A protein has these predicted regions:
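Non-catalytic, soluble scaffold/interaction modules
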Residues: 1-244
């Protein structure tokens, strides 16, 4: 049995299979292009698609978690249309003569670093948002599927962190709990967990590998603990608590 301690977002007990969710570690290549204007056109087309996709996610989130929590997707739309963000992408494409994917990735990294260095907690949270919109744009430019469901069976979802677009694309009926390595009590994952009224932990230092993935897990939201591959005594005690 492995035991990890995190910060509890919402109380309660969840018992089920653990699924480790990992983002694709995308390596964006810097490619010289002959026609920067054509590359800018690709970016503008991707941006239009991205804004439309975020509108769909906003409507979905409104139905599932309410307008207040869905508003983050309107924020993402505004960030995608932000003059500073767009001017940075354009400058990199035209001054360096490179592909749109590289320009978006570089801009996203630069803006995320800027937000992460800020003193205000709210502004630091925006680093994850700018990474999310940049990843969406890169996925569109690459022709990837950005709307696929991320979970197909009931499970405790364990991840490094989860972006708003990732949480809203999950089948809520199959999410037993959220557990993230990073994230704060004010993160989007935490807010969603409270809205869904499911046990959840953030700031939990557990490995995201085969020692956890697929194992039986217990999330104890009362004290911020996750048990991986629990012994029979612990499992019986938690099952009893859940029925009380």
């Amino acid at each position: 049995m492995q035991i990890y301690q995190g910060k509890s977002v919402f109380s309660g007990t969840a018992i089920g299979k653990i699924r480790v969710y990992k983002k694709n570690e995308r390596q964006v290549k810097r490619v010289k292009v002959e026609n920067p204007d054509a590359e800018m056109a690709r970016f503008e087309e991707a941006k239009a698609k991205g804004i439309a996709q975020l509108g769909v996610l906003y409507e979905k989130a409104c139905k599932e978690v309410g307008e207040a929590n869905a508003a983050i997707f309107e924020v993402h739309q505004m960030m995608m249309e932000d003059d500073g963000y767009n001017e940075s992408v354009e400058n990199i494409i035209k001054s360096q003569g490179v592909n749109a994917e590289y320009a978006v990735a570089t801009t996203g990294d630069n803006f995320a670093q800027m937000f992460s260095a800020m003193d205000d907690d709210y502004m630091r949270e925006r680093a994850a948002d700018v990474k999310d919109i940049s990843e969406r744009l890169i996925s569109i430019l690459n022709g990837d599927d950005t709307d696929a469901s991320l979970n197909d069976e009931p499970a405790i979802i364990v991840a490094d962190d989860l972006a708003p677009s990732e949480t809203v694309q999950m089948d809520k009926d199959k999410v037993l709990s959220f557990v993230t390595v990073h994230g704060s009590l004010n993160s989007h994952t935490a807010i969603l967990a409270r809205t869904m009224a499911i046990p959840a932990l953030v700031g939990t230092p557990l490995p995201l590998d085969e020692s956890v993935d697929g194992k039986l897990g217990i999330v104890d939201g009362s004290d911020g603990t996750i048990y991986v591959d629990p012994d029979e005594e612990t499992l019986a005690a938690m099952q009893k608590r859940r029925t009380e």
